[in-house]
């Protein structure tokens, strides 16, 4: 059984017991979270597709950890003009473990 849901402007395909990295959620580590924007649920040959969301579809998960990703370097450069700027960015994320899928 697997499902596709929406969180943080992105879509994720998950199955029960899987750990997924999402955009940062303001929920403490160890707490439960429920996603109701379920786009599709598949159970063997039976597939439910939402318009845009599946009626009664819910994904239950537990927050495992919060953190920051790898640093992305941003460079602005103009040749022959002695101009160079550097910046960096590290995106916050939340790891969640899927505990249940229902539709």
Curated annotation (Swiss-Prot):
Q: Which Pfam families match?
A: Ribosomal_L21p (PF00829)
Q: Which UniProt keywords apply?
A: Ribonucleoprotein, Ribosomal protein, RNA-binding, rRNA-binding
Among the GO biological process terms of this entry, one is:
translation
Which domain of life does the protein's organism represent? Bacteria
Alphabetically, the GO molecular function entries are: rRNA binding; structural constituent of ribosome
Which InterPro entries does this chain map to? Answer: bL21-like (IPR028909), bL21-like_sf (IPR036164), Ribosomal_bL21 (IPR001787), Ribosomal_bL21_CS (IPR018258)
Gene Ontology cellular component list: cytoplasm; ribonucleoprotein complex; ribosome
The function of this protein is: This protein binds to 23S rRNA in the presence of protein L20.
Q: Which NCBIfam families match?
A: L21
Protein family according to the UniProt entry: Belongs to the bacterial ribosomal protein bL21 family.
* Binding partners and assembly: Part of the 50S ribosomal subunit. Contacts protein L20.
Return the protein name: Large ribosomal subunit protein bL21
> What's the name of its gene?
rplU
